[in-house]
């Protein structure tokens, strides 16, 4: 029986659950994880068919019309780097519809339904999940605490606890929608006393 196949096998997934499940124990030491992110600004420019000269501030779009570097960067910050809508012709309506669909897929399929499938009840409220995501997206680069988020949400009528908020933030991180940044210059107990920051995976979600 042949046991050495000259082939590569690729498994793709939209969240961290695949490698945190029982499957990872069978693949231990036998796989390479490659995390795919939305387009960087330079990749976004390439996708749009625009090429700026080194240090140049103006280029020509595929249709021949001039494009300013600053306008291109502002467009990237506004619409983000999702390949499906990386185009100079993308409208605000198209962007909103697409990003809303992507978020719903992440929130419902990758988070809520997965939690239910695992028999857990930590993340069950899509509305609360959206509120937590909106809070984090609106406070990019700012320190936060689960207590602070829980207090803010409770004061607006969405009663919750810091433990629930922690579960929801963790679920958003597992779905690769947010990435946590902690202090690199602190160690030991001092690190435990600081609050982290969250950064969203794509500015288009904001």
List the model feature ranges, each with a label.
Residues 9, 25, 76-77, 198-200:
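Short glycine- and Lys/Arg-enriched binding-loop motifs that mark or flank ligand-binding interfaces
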Residues 14-16, 21-142:
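Interdomain motor-coupling "hinge/lid" segment immediately C-terminal to the ATP-binding subdomain
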């Amino acid at each position: 029986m042949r046991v050495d196949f000259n082939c590569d096998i690729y498994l793709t997934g939209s969240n961290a659950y695949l490698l945190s499940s029982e499957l990872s124990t069978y693949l231990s030491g036998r796989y390479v994880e490659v995390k795919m992110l939305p387009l960087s600004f330079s990749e976004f420019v390439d996708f749009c068919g625009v090429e700026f000269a080194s240090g140049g501030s103006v280029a020509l779009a595929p249709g021949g019309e001039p494009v300013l570097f600053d306008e291109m960067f502002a467009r990237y910050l506004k619409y983000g780097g999702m390949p499906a809508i990386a185009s100079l012709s993308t409208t605000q309506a198209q962007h909103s519809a697409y990003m809303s669909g992507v978020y719903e897929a992440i929130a419902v399929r990758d988070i809520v339904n997965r939690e239910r499938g695992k028999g857990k009840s930590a993340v069950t409220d899509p509305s609360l999940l959206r509120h937590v995501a909106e809070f984090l997206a609106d406070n990019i680069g700012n320190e936060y605490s689960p207590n602070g988020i829980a207090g803010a949400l409770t004061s607006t009528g969405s009663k919750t606890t810091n433990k629930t908020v922690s579960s929801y933030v963790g679920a958003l991180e597992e779905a690769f929608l947010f990435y946590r940044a902690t202090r690199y210059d602190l160690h030991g107990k001092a690190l435990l006393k600081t609050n982290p920051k969250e950064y969203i995976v794509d500015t288009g979600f904001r």
